[in-house]
């Protein structure tokens, strides 16, 4: 191989390794068998959720995983592999891909990484069933508001009973 090709591949490995290090979550899939229309819809759904989706050679993925300190991820890079990276939302790649896989049997989830830990297909599917960040924040907010609301109702009830007693 020429030095130019080796340099280009080394650059690709470095770019992918940086993406792996920066990612909040990574989902690895086998998209073999998807139609062009299905692939287009999947990519659009991922892009709308802020997820980067790439088909990358297994040799580059393996070297990048090693460089990123994710050696155990290399076992997923067998056969055609596509990788979804999300730097912000941990749940987005799992949720979009799992939802899409329900309607497209050709899409196979191989596993992934969440906050630096290798995850199985089952863990990816469990993650996909969680609400997104906004949903979790709204649940937390409602839990935090409940005691305040109860105190307000109690104060209102006491005030109303005193008004009734004074009249």
UniProtKB/Swiss-Prot annotation:
Keywords: Ribonucleoprotein, Ribosomal protein, RNA-binding, rRNA-binding
Positions in coiled-coil regions: none
Gene Ontology terms, MF aspect: large ribosomal subunit rRNA binding; structural constituent of ribosome
SUPFAM superfamilies with a match to the protein in the record: Ribosomal protein L10-like (SSF160369)
GO BP annotations, alphabetical order: translation
Keyword Cell inner membrane applies: no
PROSITE patterns attached to this UniProt entry: RIBOSOMAL_L10 (PS01109)
Domain of life: Bacteria
Job of this protein: Forms part of the ribosomal stalk, playing a central role in the interaction of the ribosome with GTP-bound translation factors.
PANTHER family assigned to the protein according to its UniProt record, in alphabetical order: 39S RIBOSOMAL PROTEIN L10, MITOCHONDRIAL (PTHR11560)
Family: Belongs to the universal ribosomal protein uL10 family.
Subunit field text: Part of the ribosomal stalk of the 50S ribosomal subunit. The N-terminus interacts with L11 and the large rRNA to form the base of the stalk. The C-terminus forms an elongated spine to which L12 dimers bind in a sequential fashion forming a multimeric L10(L12)X complex.
HAMAP family on file: Ribosomal_uL10
Protein name: Large ribosomal subunit protein uL10
């Amino acid at each position: 191989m020429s030095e130019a090709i080796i340099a280009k591949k080394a650059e690709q490995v470095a770019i992918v390794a940086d993406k792996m290090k920066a990612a909040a979550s990574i989902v690895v899939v086998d998209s073999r068998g998807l139609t062009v229309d299905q692939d287009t819809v999947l990519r659009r759904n991922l892009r709308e959720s802020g997820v980067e989706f790439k088909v990358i050679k297994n040799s580059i993925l393996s070297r990048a995983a090693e460089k990123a300190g994710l050696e155990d991820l290399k076992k997923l890079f067998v056969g055609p592999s596509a990788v979804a990276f999300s730097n912000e939302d941990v749940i987005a790649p799992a949720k979009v891909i799992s939802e899409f896989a329900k309607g497209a049997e050709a899409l196979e989830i191989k596993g992934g990484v969440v906050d630096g830990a290798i995850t199985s297909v089952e863990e990816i599917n469990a993650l996909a069933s969680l609400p997104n960040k906004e949903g979790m924040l709204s649940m937390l907010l409602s839990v935090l508001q409940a005691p305040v609301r109860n105190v307000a109702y109690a104060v209102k009830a006491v005030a109303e009973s005193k008004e009734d007693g004074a009249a």
